[in-house]
Amino acid sequence: MKPYNISHMIMSIGNHKKNYVMKINVVSIFIVLLALTSCVNNSTSKRNKNMDTLNLTQKWDKTFPKSDKVEHTKVTFHNRYGIALAADLYKPQNAQGRLAAIAVSGPYGAVKEQVSGRYAQTLAEYGFLTIAFDPSYYGESGGTPRNLTSPEISTEDFSAAVDYLSVRKDVDAQRIGILGICGWGGFALNAAANDPRIKATVTSTMYDMSRVNANGYFDKMTVDDRYELRKKLSEQRTEDYLAGNYERDGGVVNPVPEDAPLFVKQYHDYYKTERGYHRRSPNSNDGINKTATLAFINMPILSYIEEIRSAVLLVHGEQAHSRYFSEDAFKRLKGENKEILIIPGANHTDLYLSLIHISEP
């Protein structure tokens, strides 16, 4: 992939007293959340007694090497549904004071040991306190049934991460941003529209999961197609109820048919090989619950993105099959602090592995 530089990308983020600017220099892909208002927050978090108890793996089991530039710890927090979420926290070595913080999640069907952890660790090397979290029902996080997604709860998880970060004594609560990858890019935008505590939002290789489930790729589904899909999935609900469990969608197809679309082959090249396989990843194994699609068909997640007032950066590959999701979302954003970055020559999954290099202009 050919490097792409932005030497003078300015996002102004202000309050009633001052305006601050963020300069972003990106080689390959990424963002920086800088120079926001400082504040003091002495709150402490009280554990929710109704929260799930999690059994977290303490060994390093990521799909990427551990950095010697950051401290790594396992942490947990909970969303407002009482679901306990597991996260990897990355903090610069010898960091002092209150830091800007970023919560990272995605891709859709992935776990924190894959792409989101790679992003979070890299950002921590550049001075941020970051968490990469498993969404509800995924990986080491709580919630049943397993391998479920939800337009509401998957969005809520980002705000839950902000809850957690905002009460940490080493985080500046006025300098918290979120980063969503693939399907979690759409959830990140949805969270930003609903939660003014989020001061900047970045999406990487974004999917609008409501749109793709309701309309198919490139919006090719008809009303009749959608009816037949609803009928099939509703019948699956009956089968699941009788069986006492939930049928999975099978994850990334394996082996890949020769006539499969190129992006399916690219997914396989990541999730089903040593590049990205992880034993807790739905995509790497048996997938998401089939009936999860029903909620997305009926509940659009990007209804209010025009009302986002904080900074937004959308990053996508030039050759990605999913590029239109970012471009269409960008057209709808009304805020002054918005940018879209198209990476020349990159496909959807190139942005899963391309490390981010952030430097001063």
What is the role of each PLM region?
Residues 109-121, 135:
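The serine-hydrolase catalytic nucleophile loop
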Residues 53-96:
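N-terminal cap/lid segment of alpha/beta-hydrolase-fold proteins
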Residues 189-272:
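Alpha/beta-hydrolase-fold enzymes
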Residues 148-169:
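Alpha/beta-hydrolase active-site loop
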Residues 346-355:
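Catalytic histidine-centered segment of alpha/beta-hydrolase-like enzymes
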Residues 308, 314-316:
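Short beta-strand/loop motif that positions the catalytic acidic residue
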Residues 356-361:
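Residue-level detector of conserved catalytic or cofactor/ligand-binding positions
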Residues 122-140:
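Conserved alpha/beta-hydrolase
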